[in-house]
């Protein structure tokens, strides 16, 4: 990894400061982490995070998925975004430099700028959970980008060395490149800390990879943001399940994230207290039949409740480093990928290894569930959100459909108070659940709530399952 030494006591910095120019070792670490090691204790990055006082300079819309671009183009995109913001914000460092005209390829990738909050001093908190941007004076949260929503991070070029840029998705700006101006010599520390957070997040992924989550290009939750919310739901928004104490973003987004440390195997929880650890309730016996005889399902005991903690509060995967080298070393075949000494750099945020790792046959349990659902009249197979909503006529109508984007995921669609609701039924561990209970199967969940006339609580309102919308044969 090429390094440049700055004068005037400036710290050694990675050229361009990109997160994406290294490979992973077989143990999930950077081949070239800083020679002095990571700057912060791991438990701090995995816990409250590390904070820096920087200036938020705005963001520039990114019109293409960063995963569709090669590493060099990604770097050009972030540096061009830095230059655009430098020109637009008075007093920005590097603003006096004359920028070359934006090339046609880059102009087709970058869109409009959003300079709301530009120039505002903020506290940037970096952790394995998110990058949190909070106004330094009024403590207002400007943005909270979960790790799974971040696709690339980079420093500036030699003329904009004090900038850090990262590309993330949120419900307001969609996919955008956010620009941070750092005090002199601090930009590399910020980049290094983000790199440390991603390495630790990746190790968490290796210890507990999700079984059913396919890492497609989607958004993470966006909590307590100061951005004005959109009036229309973007086409790539999906669903938002109710979490205690949280308000859903307008239109809803996918939240398939699991807090680390939630342990299975405990029974019915007591009310929250300092002595009550959070846990997941035990599932019902797997061998107990749930399909076929409705009377047998009706007589099942109620499912054990889950803990009250926010089950999906953290992302279950992040955009991290390519594992080609580790896979080749393990397989003992194929030439190594040249990366460090002169060849194309590797991309820290390459999602292909995750897609490859998750492209596997479904477990027997999910196969059995799919077979069981095919016998249920209210199951419609793969159906889009729009198509499902068109089938709902009166309050209490409901159906279950298979997600068109996530294999093994099932969605409950129902009509309540004239508004359609869409609830994900399978968590990242492959468990059928609502906010309060775990179930043996989707059929058990539906029959339990329908036969006992119990509503499903979601987003602060109730969804009652009264009239199943049967599929047409």
From Swiss-Prot:
Post-translational events: Phosphorylated by activated epidermal growth factor receptor. Phosphorylated in response to KIT signaling. Tyrosine phosphorylated in response to FLT3 and FLT4 signaling and by ligand-activated ALK. Tyrosine phosphorylated by ligand-activated PDGFRB. Tyrosine phosphorylated by TEK/TIE2. May be tyrosine phosphorylated by activated PTK2/FAK1. Tyrosine phosphorylated by activated PTK2B/PYK2. Dephosphorylation by PTPN2 may regulate interaction with GRB2.
Post-translational modification Phosphotyrosine, affected residues: 239-240, 317
Keywords: Acetylation, Angiogenesis, Cell junction, Cytoplasm, Growth regulation, Phosphoprotein, SH2 domain
Start and end residues of each stretch annotated as Disordered: 1-26, 216-314, 328-348
Residues the record lists as Phosphoserine modifications: 29, 343
Sequence positions bearing N6-acetyllysine: 44
Residue span(s) of domain SH2: 378-469
Highest taxon, organism lineage: Eukaryota
A GO cellular-component term linked to this record: cytoplasm
InterPro entries: CEP152/SHC-Transforming, PH-like_dom_sf, PID_Shc-like, PTB/PI_dom, SH2, SH2_dom_sf, SHC_SH2
Region of interest called CH1, as start-end residue ranges on this chain: 230-377
PROSITE patterns named in the record: PID (PS01179), SH2 (PS50001)
Molecular function, one GO term: receptor tyrosine kinase binding
Boundaries of every PID domain copy: 46-229
GO biological process per UniProt: angiogenesis; cellular response to growth factor stimulus; cellular response to vascular endothelial growth factor stimulus; epidermal growth factor receptor signaling pathway; insulin receptor signaling pathway; intracellular signal transduction
Entry annotated with the keyword RNA-binding: no
Location of the protein in the cell: Cytoplasm; Cell junction, Focal adhesion
Quaternary state and interactors: Interacts with CPNE3; this interaction may mediate the binding of CPNE3 with ERBB2. Interacts with the Trk receptors NTRK1, NTRK2 and NTRK3; in a phosphotyrosine-dependent manner. Interacts with the NPXY motif of tyrosine-phosphorylated IGF1R and INSR in vitro via the PID domain. Once activated, binds to GRB2. Interacts with tyrosine-phosphorylated CD3T and DDR2. Interacts with the N-terminal region of APS. Interacts with phosphorylated LRP1 and IRS4. Interacts with INPP5D/SHIP1 and INPPL1/SHIP2. Interacts with ALK, GAB2, GRB7 and KIT. Interacts with PTPN6/SHP (tyrosine phosphorylated).
Its job: Signaling adapter that couples activated growth factor receptors to signaling pathways. Participates in a signaling cascade initiated by activated KIT and KITLG/SCF. Participates in signaling downstream of the angiopoietin receptor TEK/TIE2, and plays a role in the regulation of endothelial cell migration and sprouting angiogenesis.
Name of protein: SHC-transforming protein 1
Organism classification: Eukaryota, Metazoa, Chordata, Craniata, Vertebrata
Gene (UniProt): SHC1
């Amino acid at each position: 990894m090429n390094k440049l030494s700055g004068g005037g006591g400036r710290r050694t910095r990675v050229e361009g400061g990109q997160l994406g120019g290294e490979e992973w070792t077989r143990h999930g670490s950077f081949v070239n982490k800083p020679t002095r090691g990571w700057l912060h204790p791991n438990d701090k990055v995995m816990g409250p995070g590390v904070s820096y006082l920087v200036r938020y300079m705005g963001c520039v819309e990114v019109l293409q998925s960063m995963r569709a671009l090669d590493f060099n183009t990604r770097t050009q995109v972030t540096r061009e975004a830095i230059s655009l913001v430098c020109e637009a914000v008075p007093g920005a460092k590097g603003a006096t430099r004359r920028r070359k005209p934006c090339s046609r390829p880059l102009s087709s990738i970058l869109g409009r700028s959003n300079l709301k909050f530009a120039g505002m001093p903020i506290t940037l908190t970096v952790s394995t959970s998110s990058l949190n941007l909070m106004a330094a004076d009024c403590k207002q949260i400007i943005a909270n980008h979960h790790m799974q929503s971040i696709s690339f991070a980079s420093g500036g070029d030699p003329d904009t060395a004090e900038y850090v840029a990262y590309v993330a998705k949120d419900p307001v700006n969609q996919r955008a490149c956010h620009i941070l101006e750092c005090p002199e010599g601090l930009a590399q520390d910020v980049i290094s800390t983000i790199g440390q957070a991603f390495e630790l997040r990746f190790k968490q992924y290796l210890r507990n990879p999700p079984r059913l989550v396919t890492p497609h290009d989607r958004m993470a939750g966006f909590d307590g943001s100061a951005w004005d919310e959109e009036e229309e739901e973007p086409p790539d928004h999906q669903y938002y399940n109710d979490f205690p104490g949280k308000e859903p973003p307008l239109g809803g987004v996918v939240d398939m994230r699991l807090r680390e440390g939630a342990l299975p195997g405990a029974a019915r929880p007591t009310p929250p207290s300092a002595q009550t650890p959070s846990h997941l309730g035990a599932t019902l016996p797997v061998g107990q039949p749930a399909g076929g005889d409705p009377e047998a399902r009706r007589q099942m005991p109620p499912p054990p409740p889950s803990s009250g903690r926010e089950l999906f509060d953290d992302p279950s995967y992040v955009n991290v480093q390519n594992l080609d080298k580790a896979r080749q070393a393990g397989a003992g075949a194929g030439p190594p990928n040249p990366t460090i000494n002169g060849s194309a750099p590797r991309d820290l945020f390459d999602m292909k290894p995750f897609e490859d790792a998750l492209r596997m046959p479904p477990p027997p349990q999910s196969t059995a569930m799919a077979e069981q659902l095919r016998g249920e009249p209210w199951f419609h197979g793969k159906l889009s959100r729009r198509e499902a909503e068109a089938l709902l006529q009166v309050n209490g109508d409901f159906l279950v459909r298979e997600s068109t984007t996530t294999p093994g995921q099932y969605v409950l669609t129902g009509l309540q108070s004239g508004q359609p609701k869409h609830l994900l039924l399978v968590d990242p561990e492959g468990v059928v659940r609502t906010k309060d209970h775990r179930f043996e199967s989707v059929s058990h969940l539906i029959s339990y709530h329908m036969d006992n006339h119990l509503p499903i609580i979601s987003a602060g309102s109730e969804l009652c399952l009264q009239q199943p919308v049967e599929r047409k044969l």
